[in-house]
Curated annotation (Swiss-Prot):
Catalytic activity: Hydrolyzes single-stranded DNA or mismatched double-stranded DNA and polynucleotides, releasing free uracil
Assembly mode: Homodimer. Interacts with protein OPG148. Component of the Uracil-DNA glycosylase(UDG)-OPG148-polymerase complex; OPG148 and UDG form a heterodimeric processivity factor that associates with OPG71 to form the processive polymerase holoenzyme.
InterPro entries, per the entry: Ura-DNA_Glyclase_AS, Uracil-DNA_glycosylase-like_sf
The protein, known as: Uracil-DNA glycosylase
Its biological purpose: Plays an essential role in viral replication as a component of the DNA polymerase processivity factor. Excises uracil residues from the DNA which can arise as a result of misincorporation of dUMP residues by DNA polymerase or due to deamination of cytosine.
GO MF, one example: DNA binding
Effect noted on mutating residue 179 to R: Defective DNA replication, reduced ability to interact with A20
SUPFAM superfamilies assigned: Uracil-DNA glycosylase-like
Enzyme class: hydrolase
Active site (record annotation): 68
Family affiliation: Belongs to the uracil-DNA glycosylase (UDG) superfamily. UNG family.
Annotated GO biological process: DNA repair
Organism: Vaccinia virus (strain Ankara) (VACV)
UniProt-listed Enzyme Commission number(s): 3.2.2.27
């Protein structure tokens, strides 16, 4: 692991070597906007903004991307809910349960699945207000997601409206699926078969499929 310093909380960002090419720009961009971001109480707390940068990228095949953290109790790990109360991760788990037949589980975490990096496009929000920090994170968000897409085969974005123009923001050619948000009305996410489709796309790219059942916590 490496680390760099920034002028505001969290003051130190610890990161895996695979993120090295974007770190100097990240530091520059963060120092420009941090004082604005940190006027608010945030979800997650600043010490957890960059926690996913500890993840390697060279072993990832799929990025599962949400728009921003939970407005309360964000952990810095996208979709993670230690007490398994958040609707998004419960819907994701339910979808994987139908796909895999696993039913006796107590939780689900995308971050423990081989080959998968869960990501949030914006790395924080004002406590209680989704997308409230979008304007501050925009340059950083684009920089980091572009870097991720240089490593993965499939980018799966959750939210048809939020990600309607995501392809225009990416420089690397990456297979992109824009699906329904897990909290979408009329149970649209339930009918969405993106997790299956991802594995078909990986096989077409001669990559190993994802074992989605690995995310279950018992």
């Amino acid at each position: 692991m490496n680390s760099v310093t920034v002028s505001h909380a969290p003051y130190t960002i610890t990161y895996h070597d695979d993120w090295e090419p974007v770190m100097s720009q990240l530091v520059e961009f963060y120092n420009e906007v941090a004082s604005w971001l940190l006027r608010d109480e945030t979800s997650p707390i600043p010490d957890k903004f960059f926690i996913q940068l500890k993840q390697p990228l060279r072993n990832k095949r799929v990025c599962v991307c949400g728009i921003d953290p939970y407005p309360k109790d964000g952990t810095g790990v996208p979709f993670e809910s230690p007490n398994f109360t958040k609707k998004s991760i419960k819907e994701i788990a339910s979808s994987i349960s139908r796909l895999t037949g696993v039913i006796d589980y107590k939780g689900y975490n995308l971050n423990i699945i081989d080959g998968v990096i869960p990501w949030n496009y914006y790395l924080s929000c004002k406590l209680g207000e989704t997308k409230s920090h979008a304007i501050y994170w925009d340059k950083i968000s684009k920089l980091l997601l572009q870097h991720i897409t240089k490593h993965v085969s499939v980018l799966y974005c959750l939210g048809k409206t939020d990600f309607s123009n995501i392809r225009a923001k990416l420089e690397s050619p990456v297979t992109t699926i824009v699906g329904y948000h897990p909290a979408a009305r009329d149970r649209q996410f339930e009918k969405d078969r993106s997790f299956e489709i991802i594995n078909v796309l990986l096989e077409l790219d001669n990559k190993a499929p994802i074992n989605w059942a690995q995310g279950f916590i018992y």
